[in-house]
Amino acid sequence: MTKNNEAGWNLDHSYTTLPQSFYTEIPPTPVSSPELVKLNHSLAISLGFNPEELKKEAEIAIFAGNALPEGAHPLAQAYAGHQFGHFNMLGDGRALLIGEQMTPSGKRFDIQLKGSGPTPYSRRGDGRAALGPMLREYIISEAMYALDIPTTRSLAVVTTGEPTYRETKLPGAILTRVASSHIRVGTFQYAAARGSIEDLQSLADYTIKRHYPEIEAHENRYTALLQEVIKKQASLIAKWQLVGFIHGVMNTDNITISGETIDYGPCAFMDNYDQGTVFSSIDTQGRYAYGNQPYMAAWDLARLAESLIPILHEDEEEALKIAQDEISKFSVQYEKQWFLGMKKKLGLFSNEEQDQSLIEQLLKMMEKFKADYTNTFRSLTLNTIENTALFESPEFKEWYKLWQSRLEKQEESKENAYEMMKNNNPSIIPRNHRVEEALEAAVTNGDYSVMEKLLEALSNPYAYATEQEEYCVPPAPTNRPYRTFCGT
C-alpha cells in the first residue's frame, strides 16, 4: 500500500545504484495498533514535511511500517563489523531504509524505520524494538544535536500495540531515524570481506559522490576518502570527550563514514570525572571506557584503512604504507581538536606554554576529588566556586590563581573569556537519572510530560537559564553504579 503525498515525501533511492550484494529488498512487517507518541516538528520542517499531516492516521501507518509513502523502496543494508574486537558479517537486523528524503535545500537524508520487523540479517532476533530504548535514542540524539555534535536524529516514535520480549515483556515501538547516510566502517569491511574489488570500488565511489564530492577529481581519491573520514572522526570524538559523552559500543558497524554519532544503545553522559567510566552492562573489560574512546576510534579507522588497501594502490606494500601513514595522523588531529576545545572551555584565546599543564592539572584534580565534570566547568564559567571537595582543596586554590593570572595575560577581556566559556560549557546534559525518570514515566505510566519538559530543557544547553537548574543537579550518591543496556 502506498499513499498520496500531502505530507511532503520526496524520496530518492541512490543506495540501490550499488551492487545488490549491499542490500536486500524487503517490506516492513505490519503491527496491530500503532500510535504516534512523539514527533519531531522542527526536524520534520527542515526535511520538507508538513508536521500536521504527519500526525494523521495514514502517516502514522508509515512510521509503523503498515503502509509505504509514495516512492518508497524499503531495504535492509548489509555490513560487517568488529563487535568488541570479534569480526562478524552483520546487517540491518531490525531496521529498514525506506528511502532518501530530498529536502527543499537539496540535501539528502536516509529515512530508516528501526524496529520494523525481521530481515535476512536478523540472526534469530525478532526484528523489533522496545519503547524505552527508542525514546532514549530520541532524547539523547536530540540532546547531542543541541550540543552541536554531529548525530543521527529521530523524526518520530510510534508504539506498535504489541509486546516485545527481552528479559521481560516490554511495549513495542518503532523509531524513524534520520541520517546523512548509514554507510559505516563495517560497510567497507563487508565489501572487502567479500573479495570483490569492483564492489569495493563501487562503494567508495558512491560514498565520495554522496559525502565528499570535493575529492572526486583527486589524484588518489580513495586515499583522500580515508583522510576525510579520519578528519571527521577526530573532530567527532574530541566533541564527545569535551562534553563527557560515552558511546558504550564503538564497534566498527557503529562508526559512520559521514562522521555522525550513531546507535544510542548503551550510551550515557559522565557525572564524576573519571577516565575509566563505563556504563554499558556488556562492556565488562572497559574496552569502550571514556578514556579509551580516542584509541578505539583509531583502532576502528585502522579497520577502514585495511578494507581500502586493495584500492589505495596497485602495489600492496605501497597501499599498506599509505594506510599506516594516514592512520598515524588520527591521534595528532584528535589531540589538536581536543586541546583547542579544552582551551575554549577555560576561556583561553592565545597560545601559552602553560596551557597544557593548566588543563592537565585541572583534570587530575577533578579525578582525584571525584568532581562532577559538567558542573565543574559550569561553576568556572559562572565564576561561582561552590563548597565542594575540589574547590575547597589547597591545590585547586593554587590552580585557580594561575588560571586567573593566565586570563589576565591575554589581550581579550575576561568578559570575552567568560562568554567563550559559556558557549563551550553546557550547563545542562541529559543526566542519566533524569533520562531514566522520563522513560519510567512514559513507559510505565504513559505520562510523556516528564520527557517533554526534559527535551525542552536539553534543547538549549548553553542558555544558562534559571528554569534549567533542576536538571543540573548530579544524581544522589549510590552504591549501585549506573548501568546501560543495548536494547537489542
Curated annotation (Swiss-Prot):
Cofactor field: Mg(2+); Mn(2+)
One Gene Ontology MF term: AMPylase activity
Binding of Mg(2+), residues: N254, D263
Residues where ATP binds: G91, G93, R94, K114, D126, G127, R177, R184, D263
Catalytic function, reaction form: L-seryl-[protein] + ATP = 3-O-(5'-adenylyl)-L-seryl-[protein] + diphosphate; L-threonyl-[protein] + ATP = 3-O-(5'-adenylyl)-L-threonyl-[protein] + diphosphate; L-tyrosyl-[protein] + ATP = O-(5'-adenylyl)-L-tyrosyl-[protein] + diphosphate; L-histidyl-[protein] + UTP = N(tele)-(5'-uridylyl)-L-histidyl-[protein] + diphosphate
Active site: D253
EC nos: 2.7.7.-, 2.7.7.108
Chain residue ranges for the region called Disordered: 108-127
Ranges that cross the membrane: none
Top-rank EC class of the record's enzyme: transferase
Keyword Nucleotide-binding: yes
Alphabetically ordered keywords of this record: ATP-binding, Magnesium, Manganese, Metal-binding, Nucleotide-binding, Nucleotidyltransferase, Transferase
PANTHER family, sorted: PROTEIN ADENYLYLTRANSFERASE SELO, MITOCHONDRIAL (PTHR32057:SF14)
Function: Nucleotidyltransferase involved in the post-translational modification of proteins. It can catalyze the addition of adenosine monophosphate (AMP) or uridine monophosphate (UMP) to a protein, resulting in modifications known as AMPylation and UMPylation.
Family designation: Belongs to the SELO family.
NCBIfam families documented for this protein: PRK00029.1
The protein's name in its UniProt record: Protein nucleotidyltransferase YdiU
